[in-house]
Amino acid sequence: MMRILKTLFLAFIAAISCYTTPSFAETAPVSARKDNRIRFVNYDPYNVTKIIGSIRSSVQLEFADDEEVTYVGIGNSVAWQVAPAGHFVFLKPREVQPVTNLQIVTSRQDGTKRSYQFELQVREGDVSAGNDTYFLVKFRYPEDEALRKKLAEAAKAAQREENFVNDIFNTHEDFGPRNWAYEAQGSPLIEPASVYDNGKTTTFTFLGNTEIPAIYLVSLDGQEALVPKTIKGNKVIVHATAAQFTLRRGNDVLCIFNKRFVPAGVNPETGTTSPSVQRKVNIGNGYE
């Protein structure tokens, strides 16, 4: 019975020791496939990266392109020479001495900072491939890569949506119903070859290499204002309809009047603001 209790007690002590004793381990960079002197490590601000330097050789640390080294602290400046340069740091061991540490702080373009912790070891011997030699240690940033991928996918999705909308717009612009009831008064030098609208946008077509004049929308109170527009070849698509537009180029002025203007932007054929919605009039109930 005493032997069993003693065994259980020793097992309990061993378990408590394993549970309460902290473990410390530095992160060793992973070797590149082609040459083990080139190494990679994922960034973690709470990991210590192990660096092994060889006498008569140097080690290059490479951080993200948007980082710049702003502070370097080293435990043993006698055994190691440190030279920061942009988002790089160059290390050169001078003599074999006990393990020391290196701390680096970088600033990013967005104003945030990153902190790096290193354990530095020095060894003598051959620096050829196959030995425990470090020439370049490049940091990787999985979270940044994931964010960049997410933003790129979002940008592609937005572009696809924009292309889809533009395709619909172009189809409606090219083949949809049009209002051609426009008149012009003023200088013939800046007169467009044609003007029409589809109930939402107004298209001005100019001949050949004609210098396109400025196009102003004239409000109901007579005020002129520039409006958003899209230029496609010799066409200027104004993103609005109006009772009157004024074209100006130098001293030349031309007024364009829409004889069928409807302030609500009614489609000239369907009677609504959408080519897919047909307006119907119900007689006898007081509504239409």
Swiss-Prot record:
Cellular component terms (Gene Ontology): periplasmic space
Inducing stimuli:
During the interaction with the intracellular environment of host cells.
For this UniProt entry, which residues form the secretion signal? Answer: 1-25
Q: Does the keyword Cytoplasm apply?
A: no
Q: Which InterPro entries match?
A: Conjugal_tfr_TrbG/VirB9/CagX, VirB9, VirB9/CagX/TrbG_C, VirB9/CagX/TrbG_C_sf
**Which stretches does the entry tag as region Disordered?**
267-288
Subcellular location field: Periplasm
Principal location: periplasm
The UniProt keywords, alphabetically, are:
Periplasm, Signal, Transport, Virulence
**Keyword Chaperone among record annotations:** no
A Pfam match: CagX
Highest taxon above the source species = Bacteria
Q: Which residues form a coiled coil?
A: none
Q: Where is the composition biased (Polar residues)?
A: 269-279
What this chain does, per the record?
Answer: The type IV secretion system VirB/VirD4 is a major virulence determinant for subversion of human endothelial cell (HEC) function. VirB-dependent changes of HEC include massive cytoskeletal rearrangements, a pro-inflammatory activation by nuclear factor NF-kappa-B, inhibition of early and late events of apoptosis, leading to an increased cell survival, and, at high infection doses, a cytostatic or cytotoxic effect, which interferes with a potent VirB-independent mitogenic activity. These changes of HEC require the T4S coupling protein VirD4 and at least one of the effector proteins BepA-G.
Assembly and partners are described as:
Interacts with virB8, virB10, virB11 and the 15 kDa protein that is encoded within the VirB locus.
Instruction: Report the sequence similarity comment from the record.
Output: Belongs to the TrbG/VirB9 family.
Give the NCBIfam families listed for this entry.
VirB9 (TIGR02781)
- What this protein is called in its record is Type IV secretion system protein virB9
Give the gene name. Answer: virB9
